[in-house]
Every structure is written in structure tokens, then in C-alpha cells.
């Protein structure tokens, strides 16, 4: 049997090692941010034409399973573009003090509860729209602050 001190220590260490958000893409051991390629860079505030990138791009292969980063509610559909229909899909998730938009996924649902690490959907085919890009999930805080620290 474990002592109370041992159990308390384990409870404190586990979340610290896990980080606040779950691994977002199947087959990855961490939430790695996209580096620069011919289509731009994936870090927060990277230059994009005449604007700054307002989220982060987490590497993920086209067609991979995408997981919820935290427990919360899927609030509805989000579309990043007016066109580019092959990848123009995503969701808004809110819970535990977080509110994010996740783009380039085909979600399993647009409303309802979701748990941290539960299947959220599938990454859409970025290569069809942006050949040669490092395929990724775009994650953006609803208040446009930097989400990098939660990855």
C-alpha cells in the first residue's frame, strides 16, 4: 500500500509531466510546431503576407486522427477561409479556462462534450491545397493570445 505522501507526490508529478494539453495528433510523441517551408512558418506571430500568424501549426499527417487537447465542449464549426473547400473546416472548443479554434480537421461532431485525448476528428488533405507544405493542425486561442505554452 502507498503512503499518503507517495500518492500526493504522484498526483503532483503526473500533470506536470503531461502538460496542460494532450498530444493532438495520432502517431506523434509531442505537439511539435511546424517549421518554415515554402508556404510560411508555423510559430505564433510568424509573418504571413501582410499579417501575423495568430495561432500555431502543430505537425500532423494528412488523414491522421486528431485528438481533443483538453476536456470541454465543442461549441460549433469554424471555417478559416471563404474558399479552399478541401480544408475549410474546423471547430471551436471551450473548457477548463481555454477557448480555441482548430482548423483543417473533419470533426466527428460540431457540438457536445469532449474529453482530453478523445478522438476529435481527422486531418484534412492540406497537400491538395498547399503542395509541399508541412501538414498540420492550426490552433488559435479565441482571444488571439499565444497558445504555445499549452502545447
UniProtKB/Swiss-Prot annotation:
Keywords: Chemotaxis, Disulfide bond, Metal-binding, Secreted, Signal, Zinc. Residues 1-18 form the signal peptide. The lineage of its organism: Eukaryota, Metazoa, Chordata, Craniata, Vertebrata. Zn(2+) binds at residues 53, 57, 138. One of its GO terms (molecular function) is metal ion binding. Disulfide bonds join 25-60, 36-41, 99-142. It is found in: Secreted. This is Leukocyte cell-derived chemotaxin-2. PANTHER family: LEUKOCYTE CELL-DERIVED CHEMOTAXIN 2, LEUKOCYTE CELL-DERIVED CHEMOTAXIN-2. Has a neutrophil chemotactic activity. Also a positive regulator of chondrocyte proliferation. InterPro entries: Dup_hybrid_motif (IPR011055), LECT2 (IPR008663), LECT2_chordata (IPR017381), Peptidase_M23 (IPR016047). GO terms for biological process: chemotaxis. Belongs to the LECT2/MIM-1 family. One of its GO terms (cellular component) is extracellular region.
